[in-house]
């Protein structure tokens, strides 16, 4: 486990998979996230399991943490959105793990999830 603040993380072309999620979340281990980054702007596309298609738009902070909004269409045809902050950890094998705290817009539901980088 390494401190991610000692080096700048570039999330461009990284893929992430869910390893844990709160009960009120809709993503799971079958959901795959494809990240892109330009300067401090982050965006991603995700899908799989209960998610037909989702997008993320946000910022990479100086400490490598992420702040973003997400929205997706789920398998029930509902559009859902929310906000998330993610704190990175560099794992011993060099992959990135993100600890996420999120909330749904317009609802009093909050949760936490963890995603890990998937190597090609």
Feature annotation, model-predicted:
Residues 2-27, 98-104:
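Tryptophan-anchored aromatic micro-motifs
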Residues 48-53, 72-76, 102-108:
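Short, solvent-exposed aromatic-acidic interface loops
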Residues 18, 42-44, 66-70, 96-101:
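Short hydrophobic/aromatic-rich beta-strand segments that constitute the beta-sheet cores
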Residues 13-50:
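N-terminal first-folded block
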Residues 60-96:
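Mid-chain, well-packed structural core segment of small domains
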Residues 30-36, 55-59, 82-89, 115-118:
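Hydrophobic/aromatic beta-strand elements that line small-molecule binding cavities or substrate pockets
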Residues 2, 29-30, 103-120:
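Edge beta-strand at a domain terminus
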């Amino acid at each position: 486990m390494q401190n991610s603040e000692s080096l700048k993380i570039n999330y461009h072309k990284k893929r992430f998979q869910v390893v844990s999620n709160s009960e009120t979340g809709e993503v799971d281990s079958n959901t795959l996230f494809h990240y892109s980054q330009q300067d401090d702007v982050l965006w991603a596309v995700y899908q799989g399991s209960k998610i037909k298609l989702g997008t993320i738009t946000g910022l990479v902070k100086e400490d490598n943490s992420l702040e973003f909004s997400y929205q997706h269409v789920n398998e029930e045809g509902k559009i859902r959105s929310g906000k998330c902050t993610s704190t990175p950890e560099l794992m011993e094998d060099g992959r990135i793990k993100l600890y996420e705290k999120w909330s749904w817009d317009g609802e009093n539901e909050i949760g936490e999830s963890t995603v890990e980088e998937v190597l090609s």
